[in-house]
Structure formats: C-alpha cells, structure tokens
Amino acid sequence: EYNRRSGAPLPIQAHIFDSGPGYPRFWADIRAIRAGLPKNFFIRTFATAMLVVAYTIYKAIWWAKGLDNPIIMYAKLMNRPDLFPKNVPRAYIYSREDDMVQWKEVENHAAKAKELGYEVRAELFEGTQHVSHMPKDSKRYWGIVESVWKSSFREQ
C-alpha cells in the first residue's frame, strides 16, 4: 500500500527473516496452522481433518482462478526492489530442523536476493525449530539482529 501511494520502496532500515520465507508444502502448512490448536487429542484430530479439507478447497480455488498461493506471493514480493530497497541489509535466520519451512527454501530465497543485488547475510542455527532460534541461543540471535541493525547506519 505504501508503495502504491508513494511510488517509493518501503523506508525500512533493516530486514530480518526469521525462519522464512518458505514455499507452500501441504503437510508443513497444516503443521504450521495446527501449532495454535489445543493439545486435546480429539479436538486436535477433528480440527486437523477440518483444516485439511478447508486448505484443499482454498488451494483448488487459487488454482482454478490462476492465483499465486499467498506464501509464494509473499516470497516474490520480498525480492522486489520497487518495494524493498537493495541497499537495506537483510539477514536470514533459519535451521535444518525446522519442520514448517525447509532450510533449502530459505537459502534459495537468500541466493536469489543476492543475485538481484541485495545485501544478504544467512545464519544457519543448529537444533532449532521454526521461529525458536532466539530462545535456544539468544546471545547469537540478538548479536545478528544488532549487527544487521548497526550495518544499516553506515553511509549508503
């Protein structure tokens, strides 16, 4: 919306990707949606069945209308220089153990961003799940954030 009204990229100072972006994968997406469900076996099982049906219907509608999945759309938008300036430093924080977003997808997005001229830093954490890198190693996590933030103030 900002870009549409101003004709300029979003005036951000730094860009941190924590556990993403990824691409839609049926069961990974269902796991992500299920994360907020109650732990009760019966409720969780019933809700999961309903999620599978609803998600399948939504995917069919997107496909029938020729629309990109919103997750794919988001990933594409993040690498558009008319929306996000290339001189803004960005960090990708991710892990191989994430069962919601595959690490190769994060690395592919970072590589594409680098090809396009973005300033990219990729930080692979070991043994952490989706968006749980900070609790596992808060010193390293906040060090990355601080470093990216500080690098954003150099002369551009």
Task: Go through the PLM ranges and name each one.
Residues 135-156:
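Catalytic active-site module of serine/aspartate enzymes centered on a nucleophile-bearing elbow/loop
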Residues 42-43, 109, 151:
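N-terminal pre-domain and mature-chain start segments
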Residues 30-33, 73-77, 145:
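Generic structural signal of hydrophobic/aromatic residues within well-ordered alpha-helices
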Residues 48-140:
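Serine-hydrolase catalytic core
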Residues 27, 102-104, 153:
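Short linear functional motifs in flexible/disordered or boundary regions
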